[in-house]
């Protein structure tokens, strides 16, 4: 099979119907903040134990096609010495590596950030391929305010995403391109739709300019929501309509799949919105792309609450993960029942 065919096949596998992707790629800094919120010390061993809890969850593979890992996690191992990547591969779960090196302020553009990490990326991708990674993720972040995002900020990050995607495909790795339009802010739903459409149009323009094979790409997107500080929160049906319109106006049909980040919504709200999107899909007789979830906080928040850093809570924490995954798998089919919460 040619490289292109393999990439296309892997991209399709990642968006297998009714399954999602677990985003467990918190940087040590973010993971430490999450530990501290539980009253736990920000220690490497606790971070390892937490990832072990997630990846050893029985039945994980029934609901996820892949797990996104941070560099420190793909190099880490379970108690018995099994590398985390091997543990996932043995379950039929694809290790996905986060390859961006986070954001830095965009010089001369107040209030905006750009994502870094292109230097040495081709070599790093080769190394990750050898460790078993078959997909990679890169996140760009856009803030909505009266004056942002600027055209320059959108262009810079989309050019970077396209370069990263081209390097991934060259290395036999499926790029998961994640332009996150932040939920935080006091913008309306209409403004969120306008910005997300602008960002996605620029992103696909840049991917095409760079001759990236769109059939071998996964889009990781925000849902289109009014800002967290906006006077009224958007109903699930309105989120679904706005999100669909945005994608129809920006995402080429060749793209095999779009997966959602949860973006700071409560786990329940993220699931409810996913369900409304799937219901709309059924009403419309299907979308050109497969849709799925790729939540981090939206899946892990209840797990962390149940765990509390205690070994005796591992079983309860794993049960909380399976429950959240089941609910999202149902939502992906438009059959989520809030009374099951
Ligand atoms: C886990 O968060 C990921 C990485 O964040 P940091 O580098 O800031 O720690 C992030 O890219 C995540 O994969 C997506 O944003 C989805 O997470 P949410 O919580 O929005 O579902």
Predicted features, each with a name:
Residues 71, 140, 221:
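Residues that line or immediately flank small-molecule/substrate-binding pockets and catalytic motifs
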Residues 183-254:
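Catalytic core of soluble alpha/beta enzymes
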Residues 1-131, 144, 232, 236, ...:
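Alpha/beta catalytic barrel-like cores
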Residues 101, 142, 181, 223-225:
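Short, histidine-centered active-site or binding-site loop motifs used for metal coordination
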Residues 121-207:
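Helix-rich catalytic cores of soluble enzyme domains
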Residues 74-75, 182-184, 226, 300:
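Short, active-site-adjacent cap segments at secondary-structure transitions
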């Amino acid at each position: 099979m040619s490289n292109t065919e393999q990439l296309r096949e892997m991209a399709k596998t990642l968006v297998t119907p009714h399954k999602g992707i677990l985003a467990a790629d918190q940087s040590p800094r973010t993971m430490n903040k999450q530990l501290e919120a539980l009253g736990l010390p920000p220690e490497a061993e606790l971070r390892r134990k937490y990832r072990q809890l997630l990846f050893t969850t029985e039945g994980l593979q029934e609901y996820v096609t892949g797990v996104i890992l941070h560099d420190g996690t793909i190099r880490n191992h379970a108690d018995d010495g099994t590398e985390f990547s091997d543990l996932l591969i043995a379950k039929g779960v694809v290790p996905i590596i986060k390859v961006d090196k986070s954001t830095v302020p965009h010089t001369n553009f107040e209030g905006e950030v750009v994502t870094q990490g292109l230097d040495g990326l081709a070599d790093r991708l080769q190394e990750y391929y050898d460790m078993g990674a078959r997909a990679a993720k890169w996140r760009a972040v856009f803030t909505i305010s009266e004056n942002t995002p600027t055209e320059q900020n959108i262009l810079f990050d989309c050019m970077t995403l396209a370069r990263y995607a081209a390097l991934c495909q060259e290395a036999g790795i499926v790029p998961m391109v994640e332009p996150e339009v932040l939920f935080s802010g006091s913008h309306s739903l209409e403004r969120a739709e306008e910005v997300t459409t602008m960002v996605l149009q620029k992103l696909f323009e840049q991917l095409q300019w760079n001759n990236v094979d769109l059939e071998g790409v996964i889009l990781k997107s925000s849902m289109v929501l009014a800002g967290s500080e906006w006077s009224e929160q958007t109903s699930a049906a309105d989120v679904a309509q706005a999100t669909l319109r945005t994608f129809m106006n920006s995402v080429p049909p060749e793209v095999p799949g779009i997966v959602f980040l949860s973006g700071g919504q409560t786990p329940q709200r993220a699931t409810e919105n996913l369900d409304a999107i799937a219901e709309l899909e059924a009403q419309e007789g299907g979308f050109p792309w497969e849709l799925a979830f790729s939540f981090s906080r939206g899946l892990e928040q209840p797990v962390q609450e149940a765990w509390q850093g205690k070994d005796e809570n591992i079983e309860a924490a794993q049960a909380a993960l399976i429950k959240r995954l089941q609910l999202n798998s149902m939502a992906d089919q438009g059959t989520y029942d809030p009374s099951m919460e």
